[in-house]
């Protein structure tokens, strides 16, 4: 029988651990909840000011919602005079999702000013305010929608 050194044992353990993590992740990915048909539609008003380092993750957390992003969620990004690459990143996502993302620019006036300006462009019954450094749980809008539907039917 072949005797392995401690270094070889560690190497084999790393390889096997990596293999099983990948295998298990693939196996369990089949059990993710299905997309959910919404009861209502939602707008997000998001004030933007020099937050380029958060924007990619922010958009991805909304696009990957269990509630279908393309049909149910609208993001109104109000650029409050950013001097970094925030506008460029927003426009990249806006180009990919033109029906879901609106980009507005205004001179710097603060978070409240940007939110109030964004309110003028909301066309849905339901609204939430998020900041670009907020990353939403995958089920956020699903849970909101489910509860609105449940309590709306009670009245």
What residue ranges belong to the model's regions?
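Cell-envelope/extracellular polymer assembly enzymes that use nucleotide-activated donors
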Residues: 40-45, 61, 74
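Short beta-strand/loop segment that forms part of the nucleotide-sugar
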Residues: 46, 71-81, 102-107, 132
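Short, well-formed alpha-helical segments that are part of the catalytic scaffolds
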Residues: 51-65
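Acidic helix N-cap motif at the loop->helix transition within catalytic regions
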Residues: 54-56, 84-93, 135, 139
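A conserved acidic beta->alpha catalytic loop
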Residues: 61, 78-88, 131
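Glycine-rich, basic loop-to-helix element that forms the pyrophosphate-binding segment
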Residues: 106-122
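Short aromatic/hydrophobic "clamp" motif used to bind/position activated sugar donors
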Residues: 127
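Conserved donor NDP-sugar-binding/catalytic core segment of glycosyltransferases
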Residues: 139-155
